[in-house]
Regions:
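Phosphate-centric recognition/catalysis
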Residues: 45
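A short, N-terminal "cap"/entry segment at the start of jelly-roll beta-barrel domains
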Residues: 1-33, 114-118
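A short hydrophobic beta-strand segment most commonly corresponding to one strand
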Residues: 83, 98-113
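Short beta-strand His + acidic residue motifs that chelate non-heme Fe in jelly-roll/DSBH
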Residues: 49, 67-68, 84, 90-96
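A generic "binding-loop/recognition-motif" signal
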Residues: 53-54, 72, 88-89, 98
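Short acidic-glycine-tyrosine-enriched beta hairpin
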Residues: 72-86
Length: 118
């Protein structure tokens, strides 16, 4: 068994305005097959349209988000779970007044966020 990794001990990255992201579990942290991370989206901000080569499970812990998956928009209110299949275009917009907090899971350690045109 490995030691617990506290989310607060992992440094934040800001790949886009209003977006905070961090990888909590990855190959670099000893995982052989799973990637786990945290995503925080400020009110009014959007994680741009993108795709992954593997499926992604999104656990919405707080906030209200509009999620677009392959052109279909859905309102997601925490607490909720959403699955985006491999190769599916998706983006997430915070439509509430408080931060959207998501924990994401990939069944792989080789994961890439590929931005696509909207």
């Amino acid at each position: 068994m490995s030691e617990p990794i506290r989310f607060t001990d992992v440094p934040d990255a800001s790949p886009f305005p209003g977006i905070i992201s961090k990888l909590v579990m990855s190959r670099e942290k000893g995982s052989a097959a799973i990637t786990v991370g945290e995503l925080r989206i400020a009110a009014g901000h959007t994680l741009p349209l993108h795709v992954h080569k593997v499926e992604e499970a999104l656990v919405f812990l707080s906030g209200d988000a509009k999620v677009e998956v392959d052109g279909k928009e859905t309102l997601v209110t925490a607490p909720s779970v959403l699955l985006t299949p491999a190769g599916t275009k998706h983006c997430i917009t915070n439509v509430g007044t408080s931060e959207v907090r998501i924990v994401f899971f990939f069944p792989a350690v080789e994961v890439e966020r590929i931005l696509v045109e909207h």
